[in-house]
């Protein structure tokens, strides 16, 4: 008998035959999708489930689980098509030498549709990740629930959501959406910590374009409704828009380098003692804030001066650009960054910015990553739409996030810190450990023009009647600025720990983080808080 025949029809009554039978089954499982389906996948610019795992996991480290799992459905002729793996590849391995668990949905098998066994495989690998304390990465490329299996498929979604919820804040959960993700399937990525999408090939929505047109009459395409750009720039559902799948996977690998394996571990550290001697680069910060309070500057430049190698790993870069969030390192230790961006809406806080920053602060707090906050905020964005859409309740999420955080918190006020926005942005009053201010800081209830209009309404009215309104207003504004628009009133009261030269910021941050590494703080015992959702 020829070798190929032995592979297809091994004598399973012998040891050699049993080994050959295993090899045959592994071969079938590895190529569960038809060649035509794989070809169509590649034609769309997409990788297969196993190709994605190969890119993500360190070479030779992947261990597959449930490779031979098969569905048990007998309806609609399903008993005649029972491929190994049931349309999802699950297992564990290493990313940059650190353990992770992973599941990768296979669109070449049943369109990646989730059935009972498919769901059980994902549940098992999630349970495995939670028990072993390692991150879980879900690669989503699925047509949704497997209709032939009915409520069994829906039940599996619910089981997965419950596991996502129980694992939240315990192990990092990252979702890669690299194809369709529709209906109930979208809620698993929504619960996870980070969601990465690929431009033009990823789509997430509860109801598709056809249903929307039937019900509401709205005519919308897949890309506009739930494409990567929509969820990165408009809805805020996603955290990064990748150019292709390789870029997406690279982003995930880099993201993992800032996160611990679980909430009981510390994030990965690459120790490198900082040279605290003043440099020309440090001195650049002394001239970064313009003389005019209304002139913007790029907060990215401030952040990059503080971080190792000026490397700022931004999250949700396209969403709520008036606030910046992301990771970096100081002396090799990961830190989270939250910063107002004067280049967008003058750095005002609005609903989107508040929720973006609140979620990021809570993620950092859950995974033991210190938070450094840079403040230049004139207040909350005024507008009827903001008020009616719930800025009070939704802005309060940022207060809640800072107030409940027990990780080291360092805040640097670079310029404006007005009104309630001053309190919200990591103030001493919410529990920040170290609050610094530049000499350019303006900490007050409001800006000079608005304050003078309220404080000196009668004086200004009388001056205007006498034809001296502009000069009087200018004099009163100058008096207000000299009296209150500075960091020293807050420093007198201990709300600011130190007023520092901008060029000394990195030095103060480095020393502060060194001291705060032994910080221990706990919250009052409770089942859980009631964040204003």
Tell me the role of every PLM-derived stretch:
Residues 1-533:
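Ligand-binding clefts of soluble mixed alpha/beta catalytic domains
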């Amino acid at each position: 008998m020829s070798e190929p025949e032995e592979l297809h029809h091994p004598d399973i009554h012998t040891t050699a035959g049993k080994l050959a039978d295993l090899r045959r089954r592994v071969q079938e499982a590895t190529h569960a999708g038809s060649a035509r389906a794989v070809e169509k996948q590649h034609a769309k610019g997409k990788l297969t489930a196993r190709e994605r795992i190969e890119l993500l996991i360190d070479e030779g480290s992947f261990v597959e689980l449930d490779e031979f799992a098969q569905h048990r459905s007998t309806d609609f002729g399903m008993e005649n098509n029972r491929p190994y793996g049931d349309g999802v590849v699950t297992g564990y391995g290493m990313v940059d030498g650190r353990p992770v668990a992973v599941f990768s949905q296979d669109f070449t098998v049943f369109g990646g549709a989730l059935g009972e066994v498919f769901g059980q495989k994902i549940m098992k690998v999630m349970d495995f990740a939670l028990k072993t304390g390692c991150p879980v990465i879900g690669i989503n490329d699925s047509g949704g629930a497997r209709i032939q299996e009915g409520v069994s498929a829906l039940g599996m979604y619910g089981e997965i959501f419950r596991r996502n919820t129980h694992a939240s804040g315990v192990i990092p959960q990252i979702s890669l959406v690299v194809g369709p993700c529709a209906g109930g399937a979208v809620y698993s990525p929504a619960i996870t910590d980070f969601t990465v999408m690929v431009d033009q090939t990823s789509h997430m929505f509860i109801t598709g374009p056809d249903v929307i047109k039937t019900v509401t009459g709205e005519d919308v395409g897949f890309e506009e409704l739930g494409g990567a750009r929509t969820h990165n720039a408009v809805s805020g559902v996603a955290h990064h828009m990748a150019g292709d799948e390789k870029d997406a996977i690279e982003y995930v690998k880099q993201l993992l380098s800032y996160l611990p394996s679980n909430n009981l571990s510390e994030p990965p550290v690459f120790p490198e003692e900082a040279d605290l001697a003043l440099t020309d680069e440090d001195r650049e910060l002394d001239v970064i804030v313009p003389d005019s309070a209304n002139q913007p500057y790029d907060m990215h430049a401030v952040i990059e001066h503080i971080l190792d190698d000026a490397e700022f790993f931004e999250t949700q870069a396209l969403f709520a650009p008036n606030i910046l969030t992301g990771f970096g390192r100081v002396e090799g230790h990961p830190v989270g960054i939250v910063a107002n961006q004067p280049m967008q809406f003058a750095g005002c806080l609005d609903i989107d910015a508040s929720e973006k920053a609140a979620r990021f602060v809570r993620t950092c707090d859950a995974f033991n990553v210190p938070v450094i906050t840079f403040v230049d905020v004139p207040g909350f964005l005024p507008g009827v739409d903001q008020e009616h859409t719930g800025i009070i309740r939704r802005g309060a999420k940022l207060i809640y996030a800072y107030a409940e955080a027990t990780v080291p918190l360092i805040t640097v006020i670079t310029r404006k810190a007005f009104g309630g926005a001053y309190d919200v942005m990591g103030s001493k009053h919410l529990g920040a450990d170290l609050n610094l201010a530049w000499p350019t800081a303006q900490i007050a209830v409001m800006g000079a023009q608005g304050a003078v209009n309220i404080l000196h309404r009668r004086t200004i009215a009388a001056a205007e009647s006498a034809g001296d309104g502009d000069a009087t207003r200018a004099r009163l504004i100058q008096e207000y600025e000299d009296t209150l628009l500075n960091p020293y009133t807050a420093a007198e009261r201990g709300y600011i720990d130190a007023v520092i030269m901008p060029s000394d910021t990195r030095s103060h941050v480095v020393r502060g983080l060194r001291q705060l590494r032994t910080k221990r703080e706990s919250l009052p015992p409770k089942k859980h808080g009631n964040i204003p959702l």
